């Protein structure tokens, strides 16, 4: 018997919707990353993108533990001298709640072309509405 190696024809992607209301950020991000990579499937291969599509709604109602709202900071640099910008988690949740979950999931994915392709399958929305009803996403229960 030969070792099975999946090909692009073997990939079967499904759509799932996750309600992020009152879920902890890091625990939710790990479950989403697991699904995006396809590690829940028996035909998982680390060199292929065989994960599912994930739609996350109500991202503005996400929770964090401890004092992270005030203490956690996100940094970016413009490339110019003195161009370091920082924003706290509390301000980022108030202005762009989708970016909080996207940043958390991005940090857990591979840092290469494959990781960027996996991240494109994640759709995050602040409110309860999403435009992916035509794909008939199944509700995904997050367990932790």
UniProtKB/Swiss-Prot annotation:
Coiled coil: none
GO cellular component: cytosolic large ribosomal subunit
Domain of life: Bacteria
Record's keyword terms, sorted: Ribonucleoprotein, Ribosomal protein
Family matches, as CDD domains: Ribosomal_L13
A molecular-function term among this protein's GO annotations: mRNA binding
A single GO BP: negative regulation of translation
Signal peptide: none
One Pfam family named in its UniProt record: Ribosomal_L13
Entry function: This protein is one of the early assembly proteins of the 50S ribosomal subunit, although it is not seen to bind rRNA by itself. It is important during the early stages of 50S assembly.
Subunit organization: Part of the 50S ribosomal subunit.
Family recorded in the similarity comment: Belongs to the universal ribosomal protein uL13 family.
Protein name as it appears in the record: Large ribosomal subunit protein uL13
Organism name: Nitratidesulfovibrio vulgaris (strain DSM 19637 / Miyazaki F) (Desulfovibrio vulgaris)
Gene name of this polypeptide: rplM
